[in-house]
Structure formats: C-alpha cells, structure tokens
C-alpha cells in the first residue's frame, strides 16, 4: 500500500494532465471575493465538480453516515493533485478508499453538545443558545466548500453548519426579541454581500448551494432592520433588493404567453408568476446517493429531470413534500418545476411592495409607482390563478395540467401573511385551516402522510408564525391564538422532557419532535428559537413578559402585527 506521505515526483507532475483529461475544474480565490464581491473571480465550483470521480466513488461507497459530511470536507491540498493521486492509486492492490479520504481531507467535526444549565426557563435557554449557534468565516481555508461572509452569523444547528437563507429570517426575529440588533444587522449585511457577490442569495453559504436560492425573505429582513434603524435601512439595501428582484425575474421580457424560463412563468392570459428552479440537473452533493436511488426508481423519466425537480424542491424549503409529487408515496414522481407555488408568489409580492417603499424613501417616486404596479399585477394574478374557488383556499397552480391544485397546505396562509388576500377569502382560509390543519400541537404542514418531512404529522416553526401573523392581519385572532398556543405548548412540553428545541415537531400530539425525511431530527434550532420568543411575547402582555409557556391559555393575544395593510385588506 502506498504510504500516506506521497512524494509527488516529476513523473507524477507530468501525469496530472493525462489523469485529469476531460475534467473541467474551475477555482476561485475566496479571500479576494470576500474582500471585494465585485472582483472579477470565477464562481467557485462544488465538490462534485472539483473532485469528479473521487467524489462519486466516496459517496457511493457510503463511507460516512451522512452524505453531507464529505460535501463539507476540506481538501488538505490542491484538489487537482488529490484527484491525480486518486486516479493513479485507486486500481492498485490494497488501495483503501477510507484511508485515502482520511489522509487527503479534513472532515467536519461534530459540534460539542450544548448542555444547558439546570433550571433554565425556555427564554433563558434560547438566549443562552445564541452565542453557541454563532459562526464566523474569518478562517475559511482554501478549497473549502464554505463560502466566506464578511460578518458573523447564526446557524440553525446540528448538521447545518452554515447559514441558510429563509431559516435566517425567523432566527433574526428571535435575535431582535433578545435585543441582538447588532447580529440582525450583521446577517442582513451578509445577505446583501451575497447578492452583490453571486447575483442572488444562495440556499446556504456552500459552493454546492450556489445553483439555487430559497424562499425570498430578504425584503422581510430589511423591513425588520428598518424597525430599528428607520428608512436608512431601506435606502441602504435598495440596490440589493433590486438585484434580488432581477434574479427572480430574469428572462421575463422574452417570454410569450404559455412559456417559462428558469424562475419565471407567463400564463396563457399574460399573467406573470414565479416558480422554484435550480440551475443544475445533477444529484445534490449533500444527498448524492439518495438522489441517484430516487432517479433509478423511476426509469420512465430522464434522471436529469428528476434531479432538477429534487433540487428545485430544496430551493422551495419544502424538501420534500407531497405538494410537489404526483404520487405522495413515490418521491421520483416529484415535479416541482411544473408547479407555481402560492407562497413564493406571495413573498415576491412582498418584495415588490418593499421595493416600492424603499424607492419612495430614496426619493424615487417614479420607481415606487412602477413597483406598486408590479405588486398590484401579481396580486391580481394570485387571486385569479392561485385561489381554489371550489375548495375555498389558496393553492398552487399546476402548469402541466393547466389548473389549480386541490391540496390544502400551510402555504395557503402566505397571501394573508403579506396582506395580499381579499377579506372574504381570508375568512375562508381561516375556516379551512381550523377545520383541516389545526392539530393538538400546532398547524400541520399538509394532511398527507407520505413519510416526507414537509407532510403530516409535522409542523414547522416558520409556518406557525406565518399562519399566526397572517390570521391576525385579517382579524382572525381566535384561530391565530389556537395556532400559537398549541405550538408553544408542544415546544414547551418537548423542552421540559428533553431540554432542547428541535427543527420540527409532530403536531398530532404535544411534546414530540418530528420525523421523516433524509436525516435524523436536528436540535438547536435557529428558527424554532426565533418563533418561540416571538410567540411568547404574543401570549404575554408587554408589561409582564413570560419566560416559559404559562400553564393556562390566555384569553387573547397581547400583540398584533405592525405591517401596513394593503388595499386588499381595507
């Protein structure tokens, strides 16, 4: 067996070109990009491209329990050299792939398990977690898949060692409740930096996330910061808000009715809406083996089509859900790119309204009017195409079958959350949510039991917050209180037993973490922490805040959202 300390001879150096024949590898100077996002550097490549057959072989060998581990591994030397070594060694007698990985890569270490002090209340526990979940990329190594950011940031926790786009807004809500406005400002600055550097906010700050984004919450983040800094925040981030919008709307000017391009859809009547899209159509590096197996299970579809739809579902944040599938029991029937999601379009309505407000703050009334017109057009398209009149709730539009889908999901609350719903329709959505989705432990994501994590019986903190705030926007305070109280009780009961907050909860009862999906239940957990703090302040009066969930349900919510209603709610 070749010893670990391989002497790269002149022969090896000459062999590199031959060993790498046909492999296209592109590198970027992370340090230069971090210092200047406008610097002319190439986009860094993900590990499946950098390492080619080595990456494929390691993942397929299942050397590590979690496929994300090797995607996050740091090469100890130039990947070109490592790959050349691998091509020369792999067919030799006694070659040990695991030993080769251990010698040539630094694997991510498991974080130290946080043991909270005994007797902490729920609020004290969350406040104590913020520094534990804070990370910095000041010491990012060359060839790391981690993308550097200028400021520190708060990660979700567990296997999620990097920042995530839509998670972060709900985390930031909690940071603001804890008085950490400096951290809120840092995280907004990081996302603004990413928009300048990459043209969009990636799924997370990893090279393998650059080909997609996530639910566009940047406008909400800037609006949150503006609560503390005033209109200065809106004016400061107006250029990045405009770039974010340009990313989502790229190609719209060339579309004819009935056509789609990347993230933009033009329906037959000329209405413009959006969908989720990933620029790549290969297995996800962080779920390599699982994606290959999913594609193989449905030989009637091109594998690249399935890969794109899996990736696009990851862009939606709902990875995975019956919402995207023809057969909820068969993941390979996923077709995310043929579905126009109601929540995405509600969020883009909010982005357009925020752009109008920011433009007005900057003194550009003409631009403000243009963005208001775009928001109004989208609102009409949502009411026309994303409302299921037969069922009485907002739903997704099916491009493949040219009709509204019937499935009720927690996404139906998003038009209420952004004040884009008509009053009578908001009342119908509230009734549907109460009748079909409200469970003992909170709001169910869907009513379908598929084994996927964004289905029954799971409930997720961000969707509870969207529902509670959206319902309050339309005076549906009783249903909002039920969602808030039941979810908080679930969080409190789980914390009482396990002394932790988790990524998702089983809402069919109280006191149980959720299941399903591609990985074990994670704790920490950024967005649960943030929503829990916000909800604690909803159920307890400001003059007498509570540190844990009270033993008896309050008669009413103590606070209401501060958003300015749109014309639809007036």
From Swiss-Prot:
Q: What is its main location?
A: periplasm
Task: Write the signal peptide boundaries.
Answer: 1-34
Q: Which UniProt keywords apply?
A: Glycosidase, Hydrolase, Periplasm, Signal
Entry-linked SUPFAM superfamilies: Six-hairpin glycosidases
Q: Which top EC class is given?
A: hydrolase
EC number(s) reported in the record: 3.2.1.28
Residues given in the record as substrate binding sites: 159, 166-167, 203, 212-214, 284-286, 317, 518
Q: Which reaction does it catalyse?
A: alpha,alpha-trehalose + H2O = alpha-D-glucose + beta-D-glucose
- What is the annotated role of this protein in its UniProt record? Provides the cells with the ability to utilize trehalose at high osmolarity by splitting it into glucose molecules that can subsequently be taken up by the phosphotransferase-mediated uptake system.
Q: What is this protein called?
A: Periplasmic trehalase
Gene that this polypeptide is encoded by: treA
């Amino acid at each position: 067996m070749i010893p670990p300390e391989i002497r790269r001879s002149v022969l090896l150096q000459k062999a590199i070109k031959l060993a790498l024949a046909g492999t296209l590898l592109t590198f970027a100077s992370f340090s230069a990009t971090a210092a200047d996002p406008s610097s002319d550097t190439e986009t860094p490549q993900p590990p499946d491209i950098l390492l080619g057959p080595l990456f494929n072989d390691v993942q397929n060998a299942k050397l590590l329990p979690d496929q994300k581990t090797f995607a996050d591994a740091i090469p100890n030397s130039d990947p070109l050299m490592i790959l050349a070594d691998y091509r020369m060694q792999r067919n030799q007698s006694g070659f040990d792939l695991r030993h080769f990985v251990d010698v040539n890569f630094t694997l991510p270490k498991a974080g130290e398990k946080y043991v909270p002090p005994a007797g902490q209340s729920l609020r004290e526990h969350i406040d104590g977690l913020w520094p534990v979940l804070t990370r910095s990329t000041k010491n990012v190594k060359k060839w790391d898949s981690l993308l550097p950011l200028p400021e520190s940031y708060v990660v979700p926790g567990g296997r999620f060692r990097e920042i995530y786009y839509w998670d972060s807004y709900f985390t930031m809500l909690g940071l603001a409740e804890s008085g950490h406005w400096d951290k809120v400002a840092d995280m907004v600055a990081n996302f603004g930096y990413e928009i300048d550097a990459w043209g969009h906010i990636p799924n997370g700050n990893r090279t393998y996330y650059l080909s997609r984004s996530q639910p566009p919450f940047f406008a909400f983040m800037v609006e949150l910061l503006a609560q503390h800094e005033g209109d200065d925040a809106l004016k400061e981030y107006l250029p990045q808000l405009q770039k974010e919008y340009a990313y989502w709307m790229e190609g719209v000017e060339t579309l004819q009715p009935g056509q789609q391009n990347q993230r933009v859809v033009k329906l037959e009547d000329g209405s413009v809406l959006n969908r989720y899209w990933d620029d790549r159509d290969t297995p996800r590096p962080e779920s390599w083996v699982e994606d290959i197996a999913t594609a193989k299970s449905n030989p009637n579809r091109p594998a690249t089509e399935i890969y794109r739809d899996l990736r696009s579902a990851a862009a939606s944040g709902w990875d995975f859900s019956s919402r995207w599938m023809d057969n909820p029991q068969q993941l390979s029937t996923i077709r995310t790119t043929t579905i126009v999601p109601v929540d995405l379009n509600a969020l883009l309505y909010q982005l357009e309204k925020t752009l109008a407000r920011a433009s007005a703050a900057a003194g550009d009334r003409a631009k403000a009017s243009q963005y208001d017109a775009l928001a109004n057009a989208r609102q009409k398209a949502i009411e026309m195409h994303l409302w299921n009149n037969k069922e009485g709730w907002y739903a997704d539009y099916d491009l493949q079958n040219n009709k509204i889908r019937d499935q009720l999901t927690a996404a139906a609350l998003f038009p209420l959350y952004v004040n884009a719903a008509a009053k009578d329709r908001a009342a119908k959505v509230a009734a549907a949510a109460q009748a079909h989705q409200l469970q003992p432990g909170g709001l169910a994501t869907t009513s379908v039991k598929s084994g996927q994590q964004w289905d029954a019986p799971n409930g997720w903190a961000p969707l509870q917050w969207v529902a509670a705030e959206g319902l309050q926007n339309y005076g549906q305070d009783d249903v909002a209180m039920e969602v808030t109280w039941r979810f908080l009780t679930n969080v409190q009961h789980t914390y009482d037993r396990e002394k932790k907050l988790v990524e998702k909860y089983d809402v069919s009862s109280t006191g149980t973490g959720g299941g399903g999906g591609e990985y074990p239940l994670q704790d920490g957990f950024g967005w649960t922490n943030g929503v829990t703090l916000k909800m604690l302040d909803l159920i307890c009066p400001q003059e007498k805040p509570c540190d844990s969930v009270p033993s008896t349900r309050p008669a009413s919510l103590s606070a209401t959202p501060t958003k300015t209603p749109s014309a639809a709610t007036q």
